[in-house]
Amino acid sequence: MLTVFIEYKLDTEKRSHALQLLTSMAERMEAMGAHQYRSMEGLDQPGLFVETFEVETVQVYEEIKANRLADQDFCDCISGGAAKLHVWAFRPAELG
């Protein structure tokens, strides 16, 4: 199981549209194979968002990443566009 984080800062002028798009994001992400989707906004940095969810395979992660980076309507709401939509996957650390 991989944990995925998506991080971006919304363009202030496009915040309303982005929030409207985010209302259906959980459903869209689950349809692509994400589990336990959450979207959070920074307390100390309003407009900074992090989405997090779990996926079962690297392939699902890569498909979701490609899909999100190609989502021009949403990326247009991000300060800096798709280049500033950061997507990272993490696996459990093997300690000891």
Show where each model-derived region lies.
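Residue-level signal for secondary-structure boundary sites
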Residues: 14-16, 58-61, 95
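General helical secondary-structure elements
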Residues: 11, 24, 34, 61-64, ...
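Short, well-ordered beta-strand segments in beta-rich or mixed alpha/beta enzyme
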Residues: 2-9, 38-66
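A generic structural signal for secondary-structure junctions
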Residues: 66-69, 79
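Glycine-rich beta-strand-turn "strand-cap" elements at beta-sheet edges
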Residues: 2, 32-50, 73-96
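A generic structural signal for ordered secondary structure
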Residues: 7, 25-26, 49, 89
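Short amphipathic alpha-helical segments
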Residues: 14-37, 69, 73
